[in-house]
């Protein structure tokens, strides 16, 4: 960018983009982490603020209950979200959804239907497989990624007799299927970094939007007034057509014709009503053409002089008069300005809003270590020297005549098992 042209510092977003799409980044001495939100909910909150500028954050949260991630999942901790919306900082847990399925053979299957935001599915699957190999998660027989265009689906087939809820807790505890997301709502406000709460985000958006809509309205007003000014000139020339033709035919050059048209005072009987719709100056039945109007008259095509062409000019002037009146109303009234912003937001919501994907719940996340251990029958052995050992029954089997069993326990020298107990 060589600064030879003007470059916009911001884009005229019609909805709170920063909240809807979220943002994350690190700069020198500062960082930001803003989660994405549901478009429809953010617009509802913005409309509520337009209706009541003194609305509290707790009331805004009736419209915006929390972040909404494109990957779905479940947010845990409503109080943490409330803290983030009030102070701009906080950290909440988000977990993927795992459902249970029972197969025809009676075995259980866990299905991961959604994963936390910014978690890589392939990395997650590899991590689960690694934990199975390391026997940190027991009871998993097979893992398959069955995801397609319709959504995420990772099938985890369990071994017979394994408790699905225990495996589910192990997955939450040891993998990224349950992750943390940090609130740090730092944004650039008026050129300076500032940590904003939920209401401040929406207030800053409305302030920005008011400025954009006001500039746009003024631009449209100038454009409409310029067009109406030219049409009035054409209307005056049509009313005085014979005189206009006489001046043009009697001029040696186009410049002479231009000067003569500019210096002539024109009668406006039929055009007076048209003039009064657009211009407020007192004409007293006479009208002076401007340079722009004269240039438009000299470039006028003959087909505009037909009855149809004259009628088109009158119709367009009336439409422009109504448009100019409504634009001036918006510029002079903040209430009308906010009404325009409100209508734009409603149109966007109707066209693009989608249902919420992320659920929000309250839950206790401090897992008891016993909840992550599979329930199974174990063998307790007591030795002569007082050693006690716990082992799985899978390590032993009943030995039949002439058969060979498994070594269930080994003992030290001169020690032996004196008692066994299956529990």
What are these regions (language model features)?
Residues 18:
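Flexible glycine/proline-rich, aromatic-decorated loop/lid segments
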Residues 1-15, 409-410:
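Conserved mixed alpha/beta core segments that line enzyme active sites in large multi-domain catalysts
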Residues 11, 23-24, 30-423:
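C-terminal interaction appendages of subunits in large macromolecular complexes
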């Amino acid at each position: 960018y060589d600064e030879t042209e003007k470059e916009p510092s911001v884009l005229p977003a019609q909805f709170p983009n920063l909240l809807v799409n979220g943002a994350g980044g690190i700069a020198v001495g500062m960082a930001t982490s803003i989660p994405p939100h549901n478009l429809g909910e953010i617009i509802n909150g913005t409309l509520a603020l337009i209706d009541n500028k003194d609305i509290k954050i707790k009331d805004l949260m009736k419209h915006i209950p929390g972040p909404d991630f494109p990957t779905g999942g479940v947010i845990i901790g409503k109080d943490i979200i409330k803290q983030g919306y009030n102070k701009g900082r906080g950290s909440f847990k988000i977990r993927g959804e795992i459902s249970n399925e029972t197969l025809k053979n009676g075995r259980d299957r866990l299905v991961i239907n959604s994963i936390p935001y910014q978690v890589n599915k392939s990395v997650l699957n590899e991590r689960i497989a690694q934990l199975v190999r390391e026997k940190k998660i027991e009871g998993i027989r097979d893992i398959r990624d069955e995801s397609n265009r319709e959504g995420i689906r990772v099938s985890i087939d369990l071994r017979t007799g394994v408790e699905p809820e225990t495996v589910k807790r192990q997955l939450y505890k040891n993998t990224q299927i349950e992750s943390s997301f940090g609130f740090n709502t730092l944004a650039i406000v008026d050129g300076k970094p500032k940590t904003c709460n939920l209401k401040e985000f929406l207030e800053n958006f409305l302030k920005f939007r008011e400025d954009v809509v006001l500039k746009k309205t003024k631009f449209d007003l100038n454009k409409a007034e310029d067009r109406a000014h030219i049409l009035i000139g054409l209307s005056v020339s049509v009313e005085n057509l014979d005189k206009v033709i006489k001046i043009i035919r009697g001029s040696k050059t186009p410049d002479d014709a231009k000067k003569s048209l500019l210096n002539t005072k024109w009668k406006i009987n039929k055009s007076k009503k048209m003039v009064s719709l657009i211009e407020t100056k007192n004409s007293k039945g006479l009208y002076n053409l401007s340079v722009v109007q004269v240039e438009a008259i000299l470039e006028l095509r003959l087909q505009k002089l037909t009855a149809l062409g004259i009628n088109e000019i009158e119709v367009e002037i009336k439409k422009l008069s109504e448009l100019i009146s409504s634009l001036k109303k918006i510029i002079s009234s903040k209430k009308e300005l906010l009404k325009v912003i409100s209508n734009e937001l409603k149109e966007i919501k109707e066209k693009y809003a989608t249902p919420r994907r992320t659920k929000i719940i309250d839950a206790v996340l401090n897992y008891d270590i016993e909840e992550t251990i599979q329930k199974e029958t174990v063998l307790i052995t007591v030795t002569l020297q007082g050693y006690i050992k716990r082992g799985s029954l899978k390590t032993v089997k009943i030995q039949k005549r002439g058969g060979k069993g498994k070594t269930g326990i080994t003992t030290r020298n001169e020690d032996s098992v004196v008692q066994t107990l299956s529990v």
